[in-house]
């Protein structure tokens, strides 16, 4: 997978939490992106699945239930917390173009 800048996020992009020696990795896929036409602020809707990876669900925004299932992107942040995982902004990946 290729790296993607947070400012260029698109549906189908994936936040990849790398596995280490004592923990499984995790992935969260971007299902949709919305942008406020006045401010340019972006919000993303995410989906994830757990083990076994055979069903996925839209993630709930526990930190801001008023806008759930959307997550507001802070493009100046170094990391983002979704669900149980904290992702670095460099963890955003995309599939290479065909």
Task: Give the location of each predicted region.
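Active-site-proximal beta-strand/loop segments in catalytic clefts of secreted hydrolases
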Residues: 18, 33, 47-50
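Extracytoplasmic/periplasmic, Sec-exported soluble proteins
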Residues: 4-7, 22-25, 38
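Residues that flank catalytic or metal-binding motifs in active/ligand-binding sites
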Residues: 11, 24-26, 42
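Structural motif
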Residues: 7-19
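Short, solvent-exposed loop/turn segments that connect beta-strands within catalytic domains
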Residues: 36-42
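Conserved active-site-adjacent core of cysteine acyl-enzyme catalytic domains
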Residues: 1-10, 58
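Low-complexity, Gly/Ser/Thr/Pro-rich intrinsically disordered linker/tail segments
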Residues: 43-45, 49-98
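Short beta-strand-centered aromatic/proline hotspots
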Residues: 25-35
């Amino acid at each position: 997978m290729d790296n993607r800048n947070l400012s260029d996020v698109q549906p189908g992009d994936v936040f990849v939490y790398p596995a280490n020696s004592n923990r499984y990795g995790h992935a969260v896929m971007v299902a949709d992106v919305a942008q406020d036409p006045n401010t340019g602020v972006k919000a993303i809707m995410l989906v994830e699945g757990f083990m076994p990876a055979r069903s996925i669900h839209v993630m709930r925004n526990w930190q801001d239930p008023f806008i759930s299932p959307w997550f507001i992107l802070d493009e100046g942040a170094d990391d983002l917390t979704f669900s149980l995982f904290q992702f670095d902004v460099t963890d955003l990946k995309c599939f290479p173009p065909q």
